[in-house]
């Protein structure tokens, strides 16, 4: 049974006032960062405070806005209520380990305990994720938008709360089994092993992570915006991503299709061939995802860099693009 297609804009996200977490992701090179920056600009018009955070080690936010961002949130120039930050999960866990070493520089068991903890698959990235959430929570933003790493990393990132909850359970078991032995070894060697420092810190994250896990699975609070281009590989990757998001119980009902050639009157042979291919895959996207908001964004003539260019691009996410019927752009 067919029904009228949903509006091809992201206006629905602006209207959903309960949203707290918005993830933007897709294959590399499809305009993911441009889309997340533009969405953040539009959200800042309707929310009191918005944080745009990059978890992609490539860190394109700085390039997009032409302003250097780092691991601490700072205001985006030209906005009073939009901040941005760039975090490398791998660096975060490295810093956490260094801090532990600085606190116990003479403890020979400190490294052993960390090695023991980090043998659990995914625990390093999961702990880094917990550190990110801790920072965000202390800042009290009304809405947080994640510019995520390319697809595979994104899906792993979204599964971190579950990984961490399981890991903490395992660590709790390790603590009860090996804690007395470690303390005994410490007393023999004349040092304070204090394994509770490490296990205690991880255990204290459990309630926090458990709450976030629930929020991520609540469609009133969390959604994922898929970004793609109208080509076979991108369509395939988007389908795989949506299936995995569904298995993680994470809501997704918006797809942004970038770089479309929409001029029906072009006489350029290469453009005509590419447009024909794009129209074929666009028809498949619309058929597969008839219950999604499919946002069609045209190929723009220049790179979208700088605040003004992003503001202009962002309008195409909230108003359906109509190709001019006469004259040239």
Curated annotation (Swiss-Prot):
UniProt-annotated location(s): Cytoplasm; Endoplasmic reticulum; Nucleus
Enzyme Commission number, as recorded: 3.6.-.-
Keyword Nucleotide-binding: yes
Class in the EC hierarchy, top level: hydrolase
Active-site residues annotated for this sequence: 56
Gene Ontology biological-process annotations: tail-anchored membrane protein insertion into ER membrane
Binding positions (ATP): 27-34, 231, 258
List of residues binding Zn(2+): 268, 271
Transcription among keywords: no
Gene3D superfamilies according to UniProt: P-loop containing nucleotide triphosphate hydrolases
Any one GO cellular component localisation term in the record: cytosol
InterPro entries xrefs: Anion-transp_ATPase-like_dom, ATPase_ArsA/GET3, ATPase_ArsA/GET3_euk, P-loop_NTPase
Single Gene Ontology MF annotation: ATP hydrolysis activity
UniProt superkingdom: Eukaryota
Coiled coil regions, renumbered to chain: none
CDD domains: ArsA
A Pfam family recorded for this sequence: ArsA_ATPase
Family to which the UniProt record says this protein belongs: Belongs to the arsA ATPase family.
HAMAP family, per the entry: Asna1_Get3
Subunit structure, as described in the record: Homodimer.
Protein name as annotated: ATPase get3
Natural source organism: Schizosaccharomyces pombe (strain 972 / ATCC 24843) (Fission yeast)
Gene behind this protein: get3
């Amino acid at each position: 049974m067919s029904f009228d297609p949903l509006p091809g804009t992201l206006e629905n996200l602006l209207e959903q006032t309960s949203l707290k977490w918005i993830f933007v992701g897709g294959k590399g090179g499809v305009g993911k960062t441009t889309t997340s920056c533009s969405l953040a600009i539009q959200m800042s018009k309707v929310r009191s405070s918005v944080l745009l955070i990059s978890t992609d080690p490539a860190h394109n936010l700085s390039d997009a806005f032409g302003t250097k961002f780092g691991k601490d949130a700072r205001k985006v120039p030209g906005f009073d209520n939009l901040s941005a930050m760039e975090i490398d999960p791998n660096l975060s866990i490295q810093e956490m380990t260094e801090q532990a070493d600085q606190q116990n520089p003479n403890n020979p068991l400190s490294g052993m305990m960390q090695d023991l903890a980090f043998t659990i698959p995914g625990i390093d990235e999961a702990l880094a994720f917990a550190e990110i959430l801790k920072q965000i929570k202390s800042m009290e933003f009304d809405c947080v938008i994640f510019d995520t790493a390319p697809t595979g990393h994104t899906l792993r990132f979204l599964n971190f709360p579950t990984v961490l909850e399981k890991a903490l359970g395992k660590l709790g078991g390790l603590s009860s089994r090996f804690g007395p032995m470690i303390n005994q070894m410490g007393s023999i060697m004349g040092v304070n092993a204090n394994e509770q420092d490490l296990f205690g810190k991880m255990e204290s994250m459990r309630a926090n992570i458990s709450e976030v896990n629930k929020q991520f699975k609540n469609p009133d609070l969390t959604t994922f915006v898929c970004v793609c281009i109208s080509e076979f590989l991108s369509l395939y990757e988007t389908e795989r991503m949506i299936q995995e998001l569904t298995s993680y119980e994470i809501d997704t009902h918006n797809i942004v299709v970038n770089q479309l050639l929409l001029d029906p009157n072009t006489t350029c042979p290469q453009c005509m061939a590419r447009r024909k291919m794009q129209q074929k895959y666009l028809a498949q996207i619309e058929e597969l995802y008839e219950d999604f908001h499919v946002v069609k964004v045209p190929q723009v003539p220049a790179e979208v860099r700088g605040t003004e260019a992003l503001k202009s691009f962002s309008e195409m996410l909230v108003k359906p693009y109509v190709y001019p019927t006469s004259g040239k752009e």
